[in-house]
């Protein structure tokens, strides 16, 4: 076998050293006045605009994703207290990637490289295989599909247990609806939810309460005002099509199908890059800390799958 020439080696190395986007592969979608960009990093949604107006508070192609913008959160959304949980007799410990609160947060796949497996002008599908890891010794095949249509942007997600034993599962997403030039304070918010989860200083739910008569009651649309939202809502009122719809003024509506019983609302006050310039409306299949509390937790048997969908359309 002959030796490789220097030129051959340079050809091999050049792709490795070529600059890449911090968010990886970019799939650009368009339909009429709508445009969206989905990315290989975490299978996330980097931007969504209509007629040149940003519906989402996204980030640039040369920027690193910050504050969870547009990320997918699996195999759990939000937090796990102490990163510790028990499942089928196994005591498991996850890395504490929110060290200031001693929590595990937002799953294991949002910083992983997903593969774009299908791509058309108005649609892209990405997949990722989550191998067993310390703290989550289970195998999941994940797929997300983003599509543009007359009813806006639709996101379909599917998870399949490809391991040999049952596994705990939940999924969420972290899009921020943009407030435009101003703050969210003046925008009317409509959240058709009867119940809010009450969290402690570590953002772990410790109780649940009716929103009736509280500042958290947005069942009738009203301006957000100065309230700092970092609350999980549930007991959602659904329309005849089974969808629950969260509406933000003249910005957008985010809907969830029946596989998402929870929606997290976050005005981003502790995060300078998003604080009150946008509001995260986070679809979630389970409550925060579900791996410990069991609230909304999905059990996937070997070969079992879970599917869900949510979407956004402009006002």
Where are these regions (language model features)?
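Short, Gly/Pro- and small/polar-rich lid/capping loops
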Residues: 2-32
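Active-site/ligand-binding surface loops and adjacent short beta/alpha elements
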Residues: 4, 93-94, 176-259
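Beta-strand-rich interaction surfaces with strong enrichment in secreted/lumenal proteins
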Residues: 143-145, 295-300
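Short Pro-Gly-centered flexible turn/kink motifs
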Residues: 85-93, 157, 299-315
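Acidic, contiguous internal or C-terminal segments within carbohydrate-active enzymes
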Residues: 36, 128-180
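Glycine-rich active-site loops that engage anionic ligands at enzyme catalytic sites
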Residues: 247-283, 288
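Acidic-aromatic substrate-binding/catalytic surfaces of carbohydrate-active enzymes
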Residues: 35-91, 96-97
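Extended, loop-rich substrate-binding clefts of extracytoplasmic carbohydrate-active enzymes
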Residues: 96-150
């Amino acid at each position: 076998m002959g030796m490789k020439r220097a030129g051959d080696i340079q050809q091999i190395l050049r792709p490795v050293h070529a600059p890449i986007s911090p968010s990886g592969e970019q799939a650009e979608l368009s339909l009429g006045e709508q445009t969206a960009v989905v990315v290989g990093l975490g299978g996330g949604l980097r931007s969504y605009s209509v007629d040149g107006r940003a519906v989402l508070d996204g980030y640039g192609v040369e920027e690193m994703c910050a504050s969870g913008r547009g990320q997918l959160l699996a195999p759990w959304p939000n937090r796990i207290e102490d990163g510790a949980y028990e499942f089928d007799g196994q005591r498991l410990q996850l890395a504490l990637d929110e060290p200031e609160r001693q929590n595990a947060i937002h799953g294991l796949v949002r910083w992983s490289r997903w593969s774009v497996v299908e791509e058309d002008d108005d649609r892209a599908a990405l997949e990722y295989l989550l191998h067993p890891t310390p703290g989550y010794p289970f195998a999941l095949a994940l797929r997300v599909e983003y599509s543009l249509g007359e009813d806006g942007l639709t996101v379909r997600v599917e998870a399949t247990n490809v391991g040999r034993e049952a596994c705990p599962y939940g999924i969420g997403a972290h899009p921020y609806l943009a407030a435009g030039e101003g703050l969210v304070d003046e925008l009317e918010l409509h959240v058709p939810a009867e119940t809010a989860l009450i969290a402690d200083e570590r953002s772990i739910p410790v109780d649940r309460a009716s929103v009736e008569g509280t500042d958290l009651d947005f069942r009738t649309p009203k301006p957000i005002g100065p309230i700092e939202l970092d609350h999980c809502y549930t007991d959602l009122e659904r329309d005849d099509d089974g969808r629950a719809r969260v509406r933000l003024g003249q910005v957008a509506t985010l809907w969830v199908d029946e596989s998402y019983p929870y929606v997290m609302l976050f005005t981003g006050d502790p995060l300078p890059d998003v604080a009150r310039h946008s509001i995260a409306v986070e679809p979630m299949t389970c409550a925060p800390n579900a791996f410990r509390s069991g609230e909304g937790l999905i059990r996937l048997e070997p070969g079992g799958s879970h599917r869900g969908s949510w979407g956004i359309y402009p006002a």
